[in-house]
Amino acid sequence: MNRILIIAGGTGGHIFPALAVARELREQEVDVQWLGVKGGLEEKLVPDSFPLHLIQIKAFRGKRGLQQLLMPLRLVRAVFQAYRIIRQFKPDVILGMGGYVAGPGGLAAWITRTPLIIHEQNSIPGLTNRVLAKMAKFILQGFPDTFPQNRKVITTGNPVRTELVKMPLPQVRLAARRGPLRILVLGGSQGARSINQKMLAALSSYPRSEEIAVWHQTGQRDFEFIQKEYEKIKIEAKVDNFISDMAGAYGWADLVVCRAGALTVCEIASVGVASIFIPYPHAVDNHQFHNARFLEQAGAAIIISEESLTETDLMRWFEQFAQDRDRLLTMAENARKLAKPEAVQRVIAQCKKFYAAR
């Protein structure tokens, strides 16, 4: 049986694409194990069916004083921990899907001379992947032109969940749809307070509440407050702290209001749905803005910076879309044209090149 070690952690934007690949690999009877970080989100999201190895490492950026001085020692410790795991498992290939666990994991792959493939989900590569690119056999990218083109760079698209890839096309879902404008609000798996607040402000002053229906993922922190506020403003609303059925949510929606993490952008393209992106302003290298541009330039999305975002802007867009379903459908179809439904298979195809004969 062939063996692959997947390295991914930290955020859903790294973990969910890796899970999509891992599940397909398991269907192909590959022995898949996972390398993550102690205390990371991967401890909650990676199913028990995938053996999960955890090392100790924290993000490097923003450290000062003693913490900065200790980082080299902590990196060495993490690399040694990853090294032991790799030597024990003996994978044919290591697939790095991002998160700060990828740094020590990738270095350990290089030390053990295990083939390393990295995948960059964002349109602007992170520091870790820029370093690991020099050691990797292949550099896979979710968006075109993330890395300078050379023989090692392959645009695979970003892997998304199978149930999203298999959803009906926009014209099937949306062409005959009537009734209120259905707005899906997402702030990432942790929620986004500024989006939550601006949405409430916009909807509370919306003149015709019967024209709007909302499904709002708030994050745990704001859940109770947002739920009570929707009751006050008399808008038809479903409020969840976390949405596990994303296929159901995207299928329900006419319009998505969200951040512009790589996973969200590619899920929206895979499904084919109109969107308003509010990029996280503190994302490293402003990568969320560049992710969103991928859809905006194709006429599939609107971008509003958080700095300039007002409830008046949102209300104006909602009014326009509520009266113009043809535009919603056109944006959804434009998004779907950019989808890479075969992304999982493209990633696996590169891994297969290093399978050992067993």
Swiss-Prot record:
The EC number on file is: 2.4.1.227
Where, in this chain's numbering, is UDP-N-acetyl-alpha-D-glucosamine bound?
T11, G12, G13, N122, R161, S189, I243, A262, L263, T264, V265, C266, E267, Q288
Q: In which pathway does it act?
A: Cell wall biogenesis; peptidoglycan biosynthesis
> What CDD domains would the database entry show?
GT28_MurG
Keywords attached to this Swiss-Prot or TrEMBL record, sorted alphabetically, are: Cell cycle, Cell division, Cell inner membrane, Cell membrane, Cell shape, Cell wall biogenesis/degradation, Glycosyltransferase, Membrane, Peptidoglycan synthesis, Transferase
Q: Which GO terms describe its biological process?
A: carbohydrate metabolic process; cell division; cell wall organization; lipid glycosylation; peptidoglycan biosynthetic process; regulation of cell shape
Where does the protein end up? Cell inner membrane
What kind of membrane protein is this, topologically? Answer: Peripheral membrane protein
Enumerate the GO terms in the molecular function aspect.
Answer: UDP-N-acetyl-D-glucosamine:N-acetylmuramoyl-L-alanyl-D-glutamyl-meso-2,6-diaminopimelyl-D-alanyl-D-alanine-diphosphoundecaprenol 4-beta-N-acetylglucosaminlytransferase activity; undecaprenyldiphospho-muramoylpentapeptide beta-N-acetylglucosaminyltransferase activity
Q: Which GO terms describe its cellular component?
A: plasma membrane
Enzyme class, one word? Answer: transferase
Q: Which reaction(s) does its UniProt entry say it catalyses? A: di-trans,octa-cis-undecaprenyl diphospho-N-acetyl-alpha-D-muramoyl-L-alanyl-D-glutamyl-meso-2,6-diaminopimeloyl-D-alanyl-D-alanine + UDP-N-acetyl-alpha-D-glucosamine = di-trans,octa-cis-undecaprenyl diphospho-[N-acetyl-alpha-D-glucosaminyl-(1->4)]-N-acetyl-alpha-D-muramoyl-L-alanyl-D-glutamyl-meso-2,6-diaminopimeloyl-D-alanyl-D-alanine + UDP + H(+)
Leader peptide range in chain numbering: none
Q: What does this protein do?
A: Cell wall formation. Catalyzes the transfer of a GlcNAc subunit on undecaprenyl-pyrophosphoryl-MurNAc-pentapeptide (lipid intermediate I) to form undecaprenyl-pyrophosphoryl-MurNAc-(pentapeptide)GlcNAc (lipid intermediate II).
Q: NCBIfam families in the record, alphabetically?
A: murG
Q: Which family does it belong to?
A: Belongs to the glycosyltransferase 28 family. MurG subfamily.
Official protein name in the record:
UDP-N-acetylglucosamine--N-acetylmuramyl-(pentapeptide) pyrophosphoryl-undecaprenol N-acetylglucosamine transferase
Please give the organism.
Coxiella burnetii (strain RSA 493 / Nine Mile phase I)
